[in-house]
Amino acid sequence: MKRAIAAAIALAAGIAGSAHAAAPAAKNIVIVPGAFIDASSWRVVHDTLRLKGFNVTVAQLPHTSLDDDIAIARKAIFQQFGNVIVVGNGIGGAVMSNVATGDKVKALVYVAALMPEVGETSQQLLSSMPGAGEGVKPDRAGFQFYDTARFHADLAADLTPNRVNFMAASQVPVSNVLMGTPSWFAMWHQKPTFGIVATQDRLVNPELQRWMYKRAGAKVTEIAASHAVQVSQPEAVAKVIEDAALSVL
């Protein structure tokens, strides 16, 4: 009887051990949104990746300063159990480039995003190859917002007006301090990097996107979309993120 019990315990332990060994690695994705188009724009990408088995976190950034945004992005990354893929859009690309995380981050995905080198500012990059849009406006509090009358044509021309009206009303301004702060770290030098060029982007010039991604040696995918590519082409964006994750996780 004792031998039978011992054998049963050993068998159960063996099964549990095998199950533990076969468990898949954690598949965590942290999204770092850009300015003007808020984090809710990533809803469909989030849902698509969740259905693929990924754990997805969308950080809510204040865009008050580079340090403020970095702190929130780092918190979101270090709250994950296991390795992480980080996705940045617009100014979110500059934020994630500066997040020093050691080995926890396994790859970076830039989605119509800024990709500064150490010492470069986001404003400097945008000014080097200006986009076709003309809607960025200053306010009296030291922030930049996007003119609601230009929002549809410049940021989301491939979306219906009713969707864009809400996006414009819920936009997140970006501080002049953030735009003018030099990057002190460029994580893309150390990590596998992927870039999405939104070929109809009027905020971040597609030629600037191509130039930054080429400089970084990124694997590039071009999508015919506006700057709001994550809203108009969510499946295509999710596919690039999924491929990046599966290549390193």
Regions of interest found by a model, annotated:
Residues 221-249:
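Catalytic active-site module of serine/aspartate enzymes centered on a nucleophile-bearing elbow/loop
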